[in-house]
Structures are given as C-alpha cells and as structure tokens.
Amino acid sequence: MEDVMLTQELVKQIEQLTSKFDQNGQKLADYLEGLVHANFLNYWDYIQLDTLLSLQNPKTDLKDEMIFVTYHQITELYFKLVLWEMQQLTQGEVDEAARFLEKIQRMNRYFEQLVSSFQVMTEGLDREQFAKFRLALTPSSGFQSVQYRIIELMSTDVANLVHPNYVLWLSPGDPAKEYLDKLYWKAGARNTETGQKTLTLQQFEQKYDTLLLEKIEAYRKKNLRQQMHRYLNEKEKKSSDIIVALREFDLYANVHWPLAHFRAAVRHLVSHNAVKGATGGTNWRKYLPPRFQRIIFFPELWSDEEKDNWGKSWVLEQVKE
C-alpha cells in the first residue's frame, strides 16, 4: 500500500513538473536525463567553500590582520542579509503587519549579532599589531561600506541623514545631488585641519556616487519609514509590536553599531592622552558618536527628551572605561 501511495505521489509530482517545463517551452525528459548523469550536491560546493576561504588576503604578515579582514567580510555578509529583508519590505512584497514585523525582527537579529560580536575587534586584536598593520591599509576605511550607506537610504527619508549644519538649507523637492553632498558621513570624511575631502571620500564618491544618487531617488517615497505608516494603527496590538521593533532597529543602526566602533577606536587609537587618526583620515571622534550626528530613522517614534539625549549616556560610560 505504501508503494502505491508513493507511486501516486510521484505521478502527481511528475505531472506538476511537466506542466512547469511545458510553460517554459522545455522538455522534462531532457532534464531527467541530465539528472541521471549529475553528481549529488555537497556542502562545500553549495557554499563555494574553497572560493570563500580564498578571499581573506591580508596586506601584511602580522597574524591579527587575518582576524581584521575576516571580520569585516563577515560584517558585509550580514549587511547583505539586512538588505535582503529590506528589499522585500520596500518593494511591495510584504502586505500584512505580521510579515512586516517578522522582517524587522530579522534585521534586528542580524544587527544584534554584529554588535555583540564586535568584541572581536575591541578585545580580540593585539594593540601593537593593530597599530602596525592599520598603516598598511591607508586610505581604506570601514567608512567606505556602501552596503551600510544603502541600508541608511532605504531606512528613512534622506532628509533625516543630512548633517545637522545643513538641515535648514534643503527642501523636500531639492535634487538628489543636493542631499547626497550634505549627508552626515560626508562631513565626517574631511580633513580636520584643511576641511578638504579626504582621499578616502574621493575614492568612495568616484566609485559609488552614481549608485547612491539612484538609491536616493528610488527610495524617496518607499523607504522603510514611509512603509511603516501602513501598519501603525493604535487599535491593533501588532502596531505596538512594530513600534518596539522599529525603535530597536533605530538603536542598533544609529547608536549601538557606531558606538561599538567608537569603543574600539578609543581602545586602539587613544593612549596617554595621544589620539591617532583613522586610516581614512576621517574625524572619528566627531563622526562616530551619535550624540553629535543624531541620526534617527524614525523620529516620530521617539520623544523629544529621547532625541535630545540620543546616545549620550552610552558615550559617557565608554569614555570612562
């Protein structure tokens, strides 16, 4: 009886496959013949393990640089996962509150992993080795992570990413180029003495400005902040859950993540009242602390007091250590 049921199940599956292949002008028999000769899939081929493990190429012989480059590659893979969820949220693929909440919670888990694992960079690098190999990486910088810049642009209105000094200069209808030139992180990538663009910023603009302009235009009206209003209804419990999740995402991206970098910078770049500059020439003491930038993706979800004190207590706690 079991064999008969299995045969019926196989017949049904073959019929479904035949229909699928017919719709695309393909012959199922040809593909079945190919399966006869194909090898079974294995783990190392599926994840392209050999290729993956060949991508870590330190620039020096200092052992801890391997940790440094590997961790940054892991970070970019997590950013890819965040963007994967965010694309579904902003492209109309999510149409109910429960799914919207699920996607936000997924992104929070990715950021939670990033923030909690940053001790690999803070505590897990030999300070003397780091001081040496970092000089071989100039002028590259984590500042140049385009995936993180895209996460920001997909999360909120571009006006919320403008440097505080320029907020009053811009109006909603201004061209994307006007906004791009005044984003907070561009101000943080200028020489602290001359005010000129660092080579780090020049390289980044040359490679990615066109892409970022496209993202600004594409997500003006469908970024995550715009999408969230479809699901905020005071009468539904899911609305309060979504608010909690979005606030958590805001904190991860704009407080905990930059301050994890700030803490690492304090540990590795400050000693005996002497402060070293970042490899990219960025002013990390002004660029990283949220209390200076006050970048908030969802300002309407925070009280005035919370916004006024954005990231302050965390910074004070870390500087004391």
Residue map of PLM features:
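Surface-exposed peri-terminal alpha-helical interaction modules
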Residues: 2-321
